[in-house]
Design a protein with these regions (language model features):
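Catalytic cores of secreted/periplasmic lytic hydrolases that degrade extracellular macromolecules
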Residues: 1-190, 201-322, 328-332, 346-350
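Pyridoxal 5′-phosphate
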Residues: 198
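Solvent-exposed beta-strand motifs enriched in subsets of small alpha/beta binding domains
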Residues: 27, 356-357
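Acidic glycine-/aspartate-rich tracts in secreted/extracellular proteins
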Residues: 341-343
Length: 357
């Protein structure tokens, strides 16, 4: 499939070689392997410390995993850091790890590149156990345990004195995230995370001038084209009813690459945003809400199953003769919520079938 990204949001990717007589560069970025015109990128030697002063990396602190992102590899600083989940048993605290897919982690940059070029992950620290950021991959059909009061309380705690109807369009919006989730099957916590990320807690110029909390139609070439709404709650309605429920979670639409936030390999991020870390950034705010509300969390409440590369049929019954409800896209790392496991026709020696959402 074809995709798109914006170099402003991601300065570095893994160089995997040249193709098409040197006219194309093969690379990995945000989980996807792709080709780009050679004259649109610059190939630099990672070991040249005078030129390459920063690259994306992961580190564990205080029991959490953080992803630091650079927007200029010639400068020794990082523009943003996103929480991408809880520290795993195979990870050490305060140790730098490298990864351009967020699933397999490496202690050295060269080991990572060598594995990518060989199409293996055997030299990663978790070769047999890929990591998936829960909030980045849980289904958009999930329901949250958080309340409208929880959502409003977090926005208020973050904005402090700016939490009023004049300075933020996210003032008292919690009710609408919950109501529209229950009506249209759009996970309230994910929509909340996207709104926080896209509108800077409802304080961005597009949010304030157009009641648009999601950057709908704010294309890179002309953000001023962003949709205008009569109220901020109507932008939540539009997002949940059309963007999430229909266009990004319904297989018949070309924008469907999996009903979850995802990255550039799968999920809403493939077609929704040019920022390759858009899904991860929204998930960051979901984790932050988790930490703000004591004793409550959605993380891990659903078990997930993942599909590898290639299209598969989703069937009505646990037999290959059953009607196919739809055929998935070929995207790898496509996730589904597991609703249960049943016995059915034996396929490749197994009679286990998953009921999925």
């Amino acid at each position: 499939y074809s995709g798109y990204t914006n170099g402003y949001y991601a300065a570095d990717g893994a160089f995997l070689g040249y193709e098409n007589n040197g006219t194309k560069v093969k690379f990995m970025l945000a989980g996807v392997v792709g080709l780009v015109d050679a004259d649109e990128v610059e190939i630099l030697n990672y070991e040249d410390e005078d030129t390459v002063q920063s690259v994306n990396y992961y580190i564990c602190k205080n029991g959490n995993i953080y992803h630091s992102i650079t927007l200029n590899i010639r400068q020794p600083y990082y523009t943003s850091t996103a929480m991408v989940g809880k520290q795993q048993s195979y990870m050490k605290s305060n140790t730098v790890y490298y990864s351009y897919d967020g699933h397999y982690f490496y202690t050295t940059y060269q080991k990572m590149i060598d594995d990518y070029k060989a199409n293996t992950r055997k030299n990663s620290i978790n070769a047999s156990k890929p990591y998936y950021n829960y909030y980045q991959y849980v289904s958009s059909r999930t329901k949250t345990s958080f309340t409208a009061s929880d959502l409003n309380g977090y926005v208020k705690s973050y904005l402090d004195d700016l939490y009023n109807s004049k300075d933020t369009k996210m003032y008292n919006m919690g009710k609408y995230f919950i109501d529209y989730q229950n009506t249209y099957g759009a996970y309230a916590l994910a929509s909340f995370g996207v709104a926080v990320n896209e509108s800077a807690f409802g304080t961005s110029s597009i949010a304030l001038s157009k009641n648009n909390l999601f950057g709908h139609n704010a294309v890179d070439s002309d953000p001023g084209l962003a949709n205008g709404y009569s109220s901020p709650q109507n932008s939540i309605l539009d997002h949940d009813k059309y963007y999430v429920n229909l266009w990004y979670s319904t297989p018949k639409y070309s924008t469907y690459h999996g009903a979850f936030l995802g990255d550039k390999a799968s999920g809403m991020n493939v077609s929704y945003a040019s920022d390759p870390y858009w899904g991860e950034s929204a998930a960051h705010w979901m984790w932050q809400l988790d930490e703000y509300v004591s004793g409550k969390s959605d993380a891990g409440s659903k078990k997930l199953v993942f599909k590898d590369q290639g299209a598969i049929n989703i069937r009505k019954e646990a037999t290959t003769s059953s009607a196919s409800l739809y055929t998935t896209p070929k995207n790898g790392n496509m996730s589904f919520n597991i609703l249960g496991k049943v016995k059915g026709e034996s396929v490749s020696g197994s009679t286990d079938w998953y009921k999925i959402q």
